[in-house]
């Protein structure tokens, strides 16, 4: 047995439990399992039984969950899905049904309950929007949109911070049947135009400035250039955000008006009433964008019904969310986690919208909000938890956190040491849910589960209805070994199509070119046959394969970033003219530390001991910067292109595009 195989076997056998569900508490997952057993005459003893039934009989599963979730519709479906069609056929779901996404999110009638808590960097005040106020605002937005001619299928976009008005504008667009798309103010002009110019919106909402990391960032000049690049825009609505209206000059922005004037344009003698256009399940709701780090972003069209039922499944069953929960997911409107978070309104839960740095004025800012508001579910990126650990933050000692029952993490693989940190320094009784999926499905393939244990370093389980497997290069299922994450059966949350992809060729190339008829997600993972848990190993397009040994970059990161001397690292392949591959590891040194031969030796030894000799990089070099997307994801593929002498043209998706130039013409890489 190879050293790598022995290591993986040892990891599987270790299976350290970090959290277990309270056997005395009945979860919504338990209730659903019992309901399915009764309705279908099945003996489903545990989650594993339920999961395997849900993918084997996926049509029955989704029908049962439709019933369990209480989705509001004006017409019931004729057929759940044509099971003779595969996932590559993109079958129609819930044919014949009529519904509205916004109606489902606004269905809860406890008018005085808070729907939105709104918090901003540098402001002590926390604003509150009740469900009744939210409905009134959505009605105002929708009436003004209708007045200017927005109709079904039109694109309405937001270039906005994470705010109540972003939620209101999105829900108003959805109530009409318009298609919503959004990006955050930290995107530059090119990044925004790379996205919005492809979908040609009729209406855009934006702000004049934002505050981040203690600084005010003016936004009007960027907005003016964006508007110039969108010739089909009929209206620009400016929402005063940092400054009062009288101090904002929008005269240079054509077809622009302030928000209050826009809302007034749709009102008559009486306040407008909410109207929900009844639409097919497959009607487009969102256009989401790929990262665009290696080319023009793909424009993924997600359906109203597919998004709704998938998000409800994740919130209600996997997250055990109820109307008593308060959810804060630290996100911008440019990340799919914003859409995912907002859908939680359909459970009656309250949302906390935070705009600003999670480290300013102190790294405790989110924990402060947990205690002030009584947040029950906190979501963040894996990187933030690593930063807190590096700063030796111990919220367990400084905060109460008594309401917090779940911490969610996504964006990048959650390291095993982060599990230890959370349970040692944050809260010992919290469910730590690492969740993973992507913008491509606007949801998760796998994630948190309130009915089964949490094991260190593992995502708890594959989610219901998601026929996820790990495949090797020959298309065979592998267990306990690294493989390509695939989905073998249809799911309602896959994009209905790509925008401007009339013959579907881009869609097929994106997901079905590697394994015909099977969705290849582009992630590398390992499924533990003992626990059912999953370890994510990085993007498969950044998979390393020196001398025939395939592994993911995160396997290297997990070892390297345990060194205090290293602030960050990047691991990429380099190819020579003969197609031979070697692995190059770049280290960004932590403050106060220098790049030394002894450190290189220690890192090589640690990788050799922890993985195998064949995992040890051929070169370990210092770098001054590592490129990230605006959503905080490390970008390996673009660096691979740069060191191969190629040009990365689409730099708008990077938070630090200048860092790419650090990898050009590196002397040590020239003679391979």
From Swiss-Prot:
Coiled coil: none
Any GO BP: response to ethanol
Any one of the GO CC terms: cytosol
Top EC class, one word: ligase
Keywords: ATP-binding, Cytoplasm, Fatty acid metabolism, Ligase, Lipid metabolism, Nucleotide-binding
Cross-referenced PROSITE patterns: AMP_BINDING (PS00455)
Annotated GO MF terms: acetoacetate-CoA ligase activity; ATP binding; short-chain fatty acid-CoA ligase activity
Reactions catalysed according to its record: acetoacetate + ATP + CoA = acetoacetyl-CoA + AMP + diphosphate
Localization per Swiss-Prot or TrEMBL: Cytoplasm, Cytosol
Tissue-wise expression: Abundant in male subcutaneous white adipose tissue after weaning. In white adipose tissue, it is preferentially detected in mature adipocytes but not in preadipocytes. The expression in primary preadipocytes increases during the adipocyte differentiation. In brain, it is expressed in the midbrain, pons/medulla, cerebral cortex, hippocampus and cerebellum. The expression in the cerebellum is restricted primarily to glial cells, while in the cerebral cortex, it is restricted to neuronal cells.
Record keyword Cytoplasm present: yes
Alphabetical list of Pfam families matching this protein: ACAS_N (PF16177), AMP-binding (PF00501)
Source domain of life: Eukaryota
Listed InterPro entries: Acac_CoA_synth, ACAS_N, AMP-bd_C_sf, AMP-binding_CS, AMP-dep_synth/lig_dom, ANL_N_sf
EC number: 6.2.1.16
Function: Converts acetoacetate to acetoacetyl-CoA in the cytosol. Ketone body-utilizing enzyme, responsible for the synthesis of cholesterol and fatty acids.
Family named by the database record: Belongs to the ATP-dependent AMP-binding enzyme family.
NCBIfam families, per database record: ac_ac_CoA_syn, PRK03584.1
Protein name: Acetoacetyl-CoA synthetase
């Amino acid at each position: 047995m190879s050293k790598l195989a022995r290591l993986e076997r040892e990891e599987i056998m270790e299976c350290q439990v970090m959290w277990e569900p309270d056997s005395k508490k009945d979860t919504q997952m338990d209730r659903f399992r019992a309901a399915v057993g009764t309705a279908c005459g099945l003996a489903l003893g545990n989650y594993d039984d339920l999961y395997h039934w849900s993918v084997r009989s996926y049509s029955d599963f989704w029908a049962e969950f439709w019933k369990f979730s209480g989705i509001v519709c004006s017409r019931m479906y004729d057929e759940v899905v044509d099971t003779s069609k595969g996932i590559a056929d993109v079958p129609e779901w819930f044919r014949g049904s009529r519904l509205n996404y916004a109606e489902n999110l606004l269905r809860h009638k406890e008018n005085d309950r808070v729907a939105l808590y709104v918090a901003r960097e540098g402001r002590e005040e926390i604003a509150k929007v009740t469900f009744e106020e939210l409905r009134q605002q959505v009605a105002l937005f929708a009436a003004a949109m209708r007045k200017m001619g927005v109709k079904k299928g039109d694109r309405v976009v937001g270039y906005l911070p994470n705010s109540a008005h972003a939620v209101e504008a999105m829900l108003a667009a959805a109530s009409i049947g318009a298609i919503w798309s959004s990006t955050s103010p930290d995107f530059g002009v090119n990044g925004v135009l790379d996205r919005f110019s492809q979908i040609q919106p009729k209406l855009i909402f934006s702000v004049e400035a934002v505050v981040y990391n203690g600084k005010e960032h003016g936004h009007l000049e960027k907005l003016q250039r964006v508007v110039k690049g969108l010739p089909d825009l009929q209206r620009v609505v400016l929402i005063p955000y940092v400054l009062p209206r009288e101090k904002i000059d929008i005269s240079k922005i054509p077809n622009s008006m302030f928000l209050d004037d826009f809302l007034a344009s749709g009102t008559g003698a009486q306040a407008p009433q909410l109207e929900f256009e009844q639409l097919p399940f497959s009607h487009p709701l969102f256009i989401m964008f790929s990262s665009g780090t290696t080319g023009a972003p793909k424009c993924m069209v997600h359906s109203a019904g597919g998004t709704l039922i998938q998000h409800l499944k994740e919130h209600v069953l996997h997250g055990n969310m109820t109307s008593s929960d308060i959810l804060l997911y630290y996100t911008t409107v440019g990340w799919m986690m914003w859409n995912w978070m907002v859908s939680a309104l359909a459970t009656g839960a309250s949302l906390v919208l935070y705009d600003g740095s999670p480290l300013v004025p102190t790294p405790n800012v989110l924990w402060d909000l947990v205690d002030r508001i009584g947040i029950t579910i906190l979501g963040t990126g894996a990187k933030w938890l690593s930063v807190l650990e590096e700063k030796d933050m111990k919220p367990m000692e400084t905060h109460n956190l008594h309401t917090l029952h779940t911490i969610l993490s996504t964006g990048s693989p959650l390291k095993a040491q982060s599990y230890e940190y959370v349970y040692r320094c944050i809260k010992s009784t919290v469910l730590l849910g690492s969740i993973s999926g992507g913008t491509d499905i606007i949801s998760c393939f796998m994630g948190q589960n309130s009915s089964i244990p949490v094991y260190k370093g593992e995502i708890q389980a594959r989610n219901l209805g998601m026929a996820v497997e790990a495949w090797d290069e020959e298309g065979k299922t592998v267990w306990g070994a690294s493989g390509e994450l695939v989905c073998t059966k249809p799911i309602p949350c896959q994009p209905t199509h790509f925008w401007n992809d009339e013959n579907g060729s881009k869609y097929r190339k994106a997901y079905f070119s590697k394994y015909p008829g099977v969705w290849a997600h582009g992630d590398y993972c390992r499924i533990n046959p003992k626990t059912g848990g999953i370890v994510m190993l990085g993007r498969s397009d950044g998979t390393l394969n020196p001398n025939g040994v395939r592994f993911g970059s995160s396997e290297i990161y997990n070892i390297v970033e345990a060194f205090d001397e290293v602030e960050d690292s990047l691991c990429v392949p380099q190819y020579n003219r003969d197609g031979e591959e070697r692995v190059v590891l770049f280290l960004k040194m932590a403050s106060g530390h220098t790049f030394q031969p002894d450190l290189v030796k220690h890192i090589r030894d640690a990788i050799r001991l922890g993985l195998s000799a064949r995992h040890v990089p051929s070169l370990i070099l210092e770098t001054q910067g590592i490129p990230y997307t605006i959503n905080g994801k490390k970008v390996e593929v673009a660096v691979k292109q740069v060191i191969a002498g190629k040009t990365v043209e689409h730099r708008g998706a990077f938070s630090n595009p200048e860092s790419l130039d650090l990898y050009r013409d590196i002397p040590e890489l020239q003679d391979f």
